[in-house]
From Swiss-Prot:
This is Flagellar hook protein FlgE. Keywords: Bacterial flagellum. Belongs to the flagella basal body rod proteins family. A flexible structure which links the flagellar filament to the drive apparatus in the basal body. Absence of the gene leads to absence of the hook protein, lack of the flagellar filament and thus loss of mobility. Approximately wild-type levels of the flagellar subunits are still produced and accumulate mostly in the cytosol. The gene is flgE. The N-terminal amino acid sequence was from strain CCUG 951; the DNA sequence was from strain CCUG 17874. Disruption and subcellular localization experiments were performed for both strains. The apparent pI for the hook protein was 5.1. It is found in: Bacterial flagellum basal body. PANTHER family: FLAGELLAR BASAL-BODY ROD PROTEIN FLGG (PTHR30435:SF19), FLAGELLAR PROTEIN (PTHR30435). GO terms for cellular component: bacterial-type flagellum; bacterial-type flagellum basal body.
Amino acid sequence: MLRSLWSGVNGMQAHQIALDIESNNIANVNTTGFKYSRASFVDMLSQVKLIATAPYKNGLAGQNDFSVGLGVGVDATTKIFSQGNIQNTDVKTDLAIQGDGFFIISPDRGITRNFTRDGEFLFDSQGSLVTTGGLVVQGWVRNGSDTGNKGSDTDALKVDNTGPLENIRIDPGMVMPARASNRISMRANLNAGRHADQTAAIFALDSSAKTPSDGINPVYDSGTNLAQVAEDMGSLCNEDGDALLLNENQGIWVSYKSAKMVKDILPSAENSTLELNGVKISFTNDSAVSRTSSLVAAKNAINAVKSQTGIEAYLDGKQLRLENTNELDGDEKLKNIVVTQAGTGAFANFLDGDKDVTAFKYSYTHSISPNADIGQFRTTEDLRALIQHDANIVKDPSLADNYQDSAASIGVSVNQYGMFEINNKDNKNVIKENLNIFVSGYSSDSVTNNVLFKNAMKGLNTASLIEGGASASSSKFTHATHATSIDVIDSLGTKHAMRIEFYRSGGAEWNFRVIVPEPGELVGGSAARPNVFEGGRLHFNNDGSLAGMNPPLLQFDPKNGADAPQRINLAFGSSGSFDGLTSVDKISETYAIEQNGYQAGDLMDVRFDSDGVLLGAFSNGRTLALAQVALANFANDAGLQALGGNVFSQTGNSGQALIGAANTGRRGSISGSKLESSNVDLSRSLTNLIVVQRGFQANSKAVTTSDQILNTLLNLKQ
C-alpha cells in the first residue's frame, strides 16, 4: 500500500515541477530571445518480484518479469531552441539571429564568455556595445590606425575576423581622414558619326606660325615658345557639325586675283586656231560675208568653250582680254590661263607657253609629311601656310619664295572663332596691290568634289581685299568635342574641379586635355599655363572599342601643402573592350565618371549588415566597416546552462563554443534593427497547463485512494 501512496506523491511532485516550468514559459512570453523549456518525465526504479525467464526446450515457455513501478520523476528540463519570430524595431543596434548561433557577451570585458540570443544592445558612454545588463558584446574591431583610406573600397567594408575576439568599442568622436584620389574611371562615348552633336571652334593659328597665348582657348602670337596645335583637316566639321571627311586628294582651288591676258587680234584672218588650257579652239570667219569682225568672232569662239576652259573673253578696244575668275569646280583644265599651243590666224599673237597662273590647288593627304611643293596639306597649319605663301607670291612677286612670314604683307591666320582669315596688311609707304580671292572645288575623273569643304572656304571670296582694310574669313571650322568634370581630392581633403576635354583629331583619333584650377599644376603643362595638360591621345579600333591611350596617368601638384606629385591613374577602359571609352556613331555622352578620393568626415550613424558587420556612415558620404559581431554555436545547444538575464554559459554537455562570423559554418545571419521574440507558444503552454493540472489531480486521487484503503485496513481491527 505504501508503494501506491508514494507513487502518487512522486507524481504530484513531478507535475508540480512541470507546472513551474510551464508557468515560467508563460511568464517569459514577451522576453526577447527567450527559449521555452519542457519537463522530461521518466518512471522511477521498479521493484522486481520475479525476473523474466527464457523458454525451455521441450519445457515451459518464457515468462515476463513481475515488477512494480515506484512512481515518476523529472529527469531533466529540456530547452527548445526553435527560431522565434523576428520583429522590427527602430533601434539600429538591435540585432536578431536568423538561424543557429549565439551572441558572445562578457561580464568582465572579455575574460569570461557568456552567450545569449537576446540582441537588445546599445552603446554606453565610452562607445562600448553592451547588453541592457551591461555585458560587453564580443567581436572583431577594425585596427584604430586603419581608417580605410589606403585599401580598396571593398576592403573598407570588411573587418579582419581571423584574430582574437575583442570588446566591441567605437569611438563616438571618430573622424575618417581624407584620402587622395589616385584613380579616375570613366565610361563615355565619343561620337564617330558624320554629324557631331557637340562642337567647338578649332584652335587658333597665327600668321607667324607661333603659339598660344593661353592654353584653353588658344590665341596664337609670337610671345611664347609652346608647340603650335595644328589639327587634321580631314577630321574637322563645318559650323553645323557636319563632318568634312576629306578623302585623299580632295581639295580646293584658290585664286588671289583673276588670271588675265590681253592680246592683239589680227582683223583680217579668216581661219584661226588656238589651244587654251588644253582645249583646242578654232573658227573660220569671212567678215565681208558675216559682217562680224575677227575680234568678235575670236571672243565668241573662246566663250563657247568656257565650261571646258574656265576662261571668258572680253573686248578691250581692238584687243581681246581673257579672264579666268576660278568660278568653276574642276581640275587643272579650268584654272588659270595657259596657251598650250601657239595660235594661228587671228590668234597669231598667242605664243605657246604664254600663261598667267593665279589659282593654286590645295589637296588633302593622309600622309604625315605632305608635299607643299604640289600643294598638299594635312593639318590646319599646313593649309594656312600654303595660302599665306601663295597669296604673297601673287601679290608681291619680288618676295618669291624666300620671304619670311613675319615680313609678308599678306597674313593668313585661323582666328579664335575657327575661321581662316586673310588680311592685306598696310605696309605704310609701300604701295601694294589689292587681292581678289576666288575659291572653287577640285574634282577630276578620280576625285570627287568635297562640297562641304569648298562651301566653308568660299567665305574667303571677296571682290577686293584692300590693303589695310577689312579681312576676309572662311566659314567656321569646328571639331567634334566632349567635356566632363569631376572633383578630385588631395591628401588634405581639398576638392579640385578637374575638367577633361576631348576633341576629335582624326578618323579614329581623339585628343584630350586636362585642366585644374590655379594655382594647381599638372606635370606636362606649359610654362604659361601649368594647370593645363595638353597632348592626351586616344585611339579607337574600327568597331569603336578603345585601342589605346597615352598617357595612362596624370601627376598633379595642388600647390596647397598637400602631398605632391599626386599620381592619378586614368582608367578609361581596357584595350579592345567596351568597358570604358568608346567611339561609335552615337551622340557624345558621359555615362559614368568617378574617382576614389574623399574628404575627411565625422562618424554620423551606424548600422549592421547581415554578416554582423557594424558599418559607420560618415559626413563625407563614405561608409566604413568599424567592427563585426561574433557568433558562437555548439554541438548541443540544449546543454547550455541558463544563468538568468537571457544569458547562458558553456557546460561540459554543450560542447566547446565554435566561434566565427555570421553566415559561416552553421551560423545563421544577423538582422539589424530587429529582435527575436520569445518562442513560447501560448496555445501550447495553456494546453500543457490543463494537462499538468489533470495529471496533478489524478495523482492526488491515487494518494486519497491509498489513504482510504489504509483506513479500511485499520477498521478491520475494530
